[in-house]
């Protein structure tokens, strides 16, 4: 996953904590009921805000990299690579809302455990631009915390994120703001175990209530574990409210190198069924639009990268992938909070997953998914 790239961009010093995870055995806390199920499926997409870093003399940044802008230039959005040009955020919101999307899930980064906080904050520029956009209320939004946590920065994360929950267009299920943690296992290890993580989440909830945001729904990003079906039990012990994924590319991989896009649908289904069947926690499914991080891997060879990619994506195939996901949600109403579904992704153009209209393809992907959303939500 490219989040490993993000961790490696910056030179930072993490404080070292002993990991003392408590046992997953014994009596579990009651699992919350799945709230907010309605007839319509609410489709959103993950948003990666890596497109506004200061550029070099050639216009390149870590993410707007030379190979991406040349060999893979077909991925360039119609407004160009940068998301911070005047009017671009307004344009993006209109494209998303006009084509049936209900919300974005912003990748959000705390800047405490890094040497260069200002550079890290560039990853949150898109969220700031979104909240300043005149048409922001056309979409709901939520946050996914993507950077390591520890007792050092936990309260800061709480205090920085709780105010967002009070925004009028913050994504809620039955009035409860939705918050996700990308690096869930690192949260547990960073907080020194399950018991401390549970206490930290309780503090988070307390701060939200005291700020007037009410009760919150806290999600744990996870992945399938066929060799250990009970792997997700620890998230129940910690007090997370639901599970989700960011993408399911690894689950569809059949070999190194090129894999047909049909394999990604199989990976998505493996995630939806495999995770939800082995956990009592509610589950929000993710539908993939592609995965191919070769441009970043080629430009940053010292960073970890996947050895595979998907080919054969078309607007029609992506739309049918979404249809399968929406039908899964409707077939499993007791498992999915708020009938939510995430698409991976709105703008992971560097990772090979995007819905943004491009100079090469126009808005064909958006037009195709719009029709599916309308059909499935009749």
What are these regions (language model features)?
Residues 1-5:
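Positively charged n-region of N-terminal signal peptides that target proteins for export
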Residues 19-35:
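Bacterial Sec-dependent N-terminal signal peptides
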Residues 30-378:
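Glycan-processing catalytic domains of CAZymes
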Residues 8-21:
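Bacterial N-terminal signal peptides
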């Amino acid at each position: 996953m490219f989040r490993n790239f993000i961790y490696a961009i910056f030179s930072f010093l993490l404080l070292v904590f002993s990991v003392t995870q408590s046992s997953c055995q014994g009596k579990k806390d009651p699992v919350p009921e799945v709230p907010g199920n309605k007839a319509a499926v609410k489709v959103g997409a993950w948003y990666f805000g890596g497109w506004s870093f200061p550029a070099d003399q050639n216009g390149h940044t870590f993410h707007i990299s030379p190979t991406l802008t040349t060999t893979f230039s077909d991925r360039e959005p119609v407004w160009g690579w940068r998301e911070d040009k005047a009017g671009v955020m307004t344009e993006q919101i209109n494209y998303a809302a006009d084509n049936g999307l209900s919300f974005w899930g912003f990748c959000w980064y705390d800047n405490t455990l890094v040497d260069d906080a200002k550079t890290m904050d560039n990853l949150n520029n898109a969220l700031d631009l979104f909240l300043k956009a005149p048409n922001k209320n056309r979409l709901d939004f939520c946050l996914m915390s993507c950077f390591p946590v520890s007792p050092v920065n936990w309260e800061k994360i709480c205090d920085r994120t709780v105010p967002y929950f009070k925004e009028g267009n913050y994504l809620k299920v039955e009035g409860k703001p939705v918050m996700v943690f990308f690096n869930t296992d690192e949260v547990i290890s960073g907080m020194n175990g399950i018991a401390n993580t549970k206490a930290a989440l309780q503090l988070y909830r307390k701060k939200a209530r005291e700020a007037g945001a009410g009760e919150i729904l806290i999600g744990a990003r996870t992945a399938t574990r066929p060799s250990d079906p009970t792997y997700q039990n620890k998230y129940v012990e910690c007090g997370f409210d639901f599970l989700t994924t960011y993408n399911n590319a690894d689950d569809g991989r059949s070999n190194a190198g090129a894999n047909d896009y049909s394999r990604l649908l199989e990976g998505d289904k493996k995630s939806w069924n495999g995770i939800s069947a082995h956990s009592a926690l509610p589950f929000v499914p993710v539908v993939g639009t592609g995965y191919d991080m070769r441009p970043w891997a080629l430009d940053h060879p010292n960073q970890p990268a996947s050895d595979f990619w998907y080919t054969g994506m078309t607007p029609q195939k992506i739309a049918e992938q979404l249809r399968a996901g929406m039908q899964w949600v409707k077939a499993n109403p007791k498992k999915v909070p708020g009938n939510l579904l995430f698409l991976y992704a709105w703008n992971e153009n560097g990772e090979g997953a995007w819905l943004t209209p491009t100079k090469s393809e126009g808005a064909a992907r958006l037009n195709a998914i719009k029709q599916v959303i309308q059909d499935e939500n009749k």
